[in-house]
A protein has these predicted regions:
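Short alpha-helical transmembrane segments in multi-pass integral membrane proteins
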Residues: 1-26, 84-151, 193-249, 306-371, ...
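N-terminal transmembrane alpha-helices
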Residues: 11-51, 64-79, 83, 108-115, ...
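Small-residue hotspots at the loop-to-helix junctions and early N-terminal turns
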Residues: 53-64, 139-143, 202, 273-290, ...
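Small-residue-rich hydrophobic transmembrane alpha-helices
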Residues: 56-116, 153-172, 280-338, 342-344, ...
Length: 459
């Protein structure tokens, strides 16, 4: 790394395939380990004696609230990180550091606002998200503690993106690994040894996130980081922040609309099939998040290379990086699809010993995940638009699958009378929306990608 210019020669000169996997593998590991935060909680909660199934469903109802917290971290960092990479490619490290400082202040401000909202309005929010009388107490126990750690979640997720943007993929992976490993240890200790149950799971999670947060801040303030977090840059600069928010709006909307999808599933299934179906969709969305995190790990490996070389005017390396990303994402989504189609009962059994809930989830999984094999195509194309700074197109594609297609299908299909089983109709909305979204996204991407990379070379 050239400290004066902020350029990393490897991003512009190293063999793309080797560089991609060097960045992607730690990012994938970090993303998959990050899933453990939620998966471990849900597995332990589902195995609580007597009330485990109800508690699992209750904690599932809190997931939209947790998604909102993560979405705001993405709004700031997923837009800020590509801009930092582009500025590194242009040799402007001072501007890149000012972006990091501005984004840090913004993350802290958002965290305080979200904490107040969650603490003051938890009950109506959880009711809106699909909590029933039976599941509300467990949902309230979890979110009332979890929301107190919002600032740790925001900073650990948000600032870690700036570590990845500099090419420090191993350090980025350790951020998540440290917290997840601690969570795995603390969960059974607080839940079963100390007898805290659901509250113990929430406390273990926020303490683990606090440790991850401390690790991230320490690294960015140290001399090991090429771009450093400096006190003088913490005052927000709106001229720098607004372009970051514009670019981060696409991943933000992806997560917010994922939240709307979760609420739509919860409310519709509660009406047509009851708490068992809501518990099943908790397991299904967790499984889908496993697929999503795998794919996002791949895109995080590609993004610094694509953004850097797009900023440097090297269209050939951008195209080569996308080719590797596309093949990798499609392969990854197909592997997850095969696992869910072949072993749905085993996947469901990981989360709960309850025979009724496990059997219902296995049945629903083959419907819900039917088109997940091709989902990698949409992620590769959509996130490449983000890496190339194409905010408007990326925002449209983020809205397409969930707001334009999936949510209306969830609400309409069980009411049209086409299917005898209303619950089947709700779950079937997912593969229909996935298929339509993949076709549209691929068509838009491949008609624009060549012009974008050619334009970079001529800039």
């Amino acid at each position: 790394m050239n400290v004066k210019t902020g350029r990393d020669p490897a991003l512009g000169t190293a063999p793309v395939g080797k560089l991609f996997w060097k960045l992607a593998l730690p990012a994938i590991a970090a993303q998959l380990v990050n899933v453990l935060y939620n998966i471990v909680d849900r597995i332990y909660i589902g195995h609580i004696p007597v009330y485990g199934a109800a508690a699992l469903t209750g904690v599932g109802v809190t997931m939209p609230a947790i998604m909102i917290i993560s979405a705001f971290a993405a709004l700031v960092s997923a837009g800020g990180a590509p801009r930092v990479s582009m500025l590194m490619g242009k040799g402007a490290p001072d501007s890149a550091e000012r972006i990091i400082g501005t984004c840090t202040f913004t993350l802290c401000a958002i965290s305080l606002a979200l904490t107040l909202i969650m603490q003051l309005f938890a009950v109506p929010i959880l009711r809106l998200f699909g909590a029933s009388d039976a599941t509300l107490p467990y949902a309230l126990e979890y979110i009332s503690i979890y929301s107190l750690g919002t600032i740790f979640v925001q900073l650990s997720l948000g600032l870690n993106a700036f570590i990845t943007a500099q090419g420090f993929s191993t350090t980025s992976m350790l951020t998540v690994t440290i917290g997840a490993a601690l969570n795995i240890v603390l969960d059974p200790l607080f839940m079963f040894v100390f007898g805290m149950g659901v509250r113990g799971a929430a406390l273990a999670t926020i303490l683990s996130q606090a440790v991850s947060c401390a690790w991230v801040v320490r690294f960015l303030c140290s001399e090991k980081s090429t771009l450093r977090l400096r006190v003088k840059n913490l005052l927000p600069d709106m001229k720098l922040l607004l372009p970051c928010l514009a670019l981060g709006l696409s991943p933000f909307l992806m997560q917010i609309t994922e939240n709307l999808v979760a609420v739509s599933f919860n409310v519709t299934l509660l009406r047509f099939a009851g708490d068992t179906a809501v518990g099943a969709v908790t397991v299904l969305t967790t499984t889908m998040s496993l697929c999503m995190q795998l794919l996002h790990g791949l895109t995080q490996g590609a993004q610094p290379i694509m953004s850097f070389n797009y900023g440097a005017g090297n269209g050939q390396r951008v195209r080569e990086t996308f080719r590797i990303l596309f093949i990798s994402c499609l392969t990854g989504s197909m592997l997850v699809w095969a696992m869910c189609m072949r072993f749905p009962g085993a996947v469901a059994g990981m989360f709960t010993p309850d025979a009724e809930l496990s059997s219902y989830t296995a049945w629903a999984m083959r419907i819900y995940m039917a088109a997940s094999g091709i989902f990698g195509i949409q992620i590769a194309c959509q996130q490449s638009f983000v890496a190339l700074g194409q905010a408007k197109v990326a925002i449209f594609l983020a809205l397409l699958r969930k707001v334009i297609l999936l949510i209306p299908l969830i609400l309409l299909l069980p009411r049209l009378g086409i299917f005898k089983n209303a619950a089947f109709a709700v779950f079937f909305a997912e593969p229909v929306a996935d298929t339509l979204a993949v076709c549209t996204t691929a068509a838009m991407f491949f008609t624009r990608f060549g012009k974008l990379t050619a334009g970079a070379e001529n800039a």
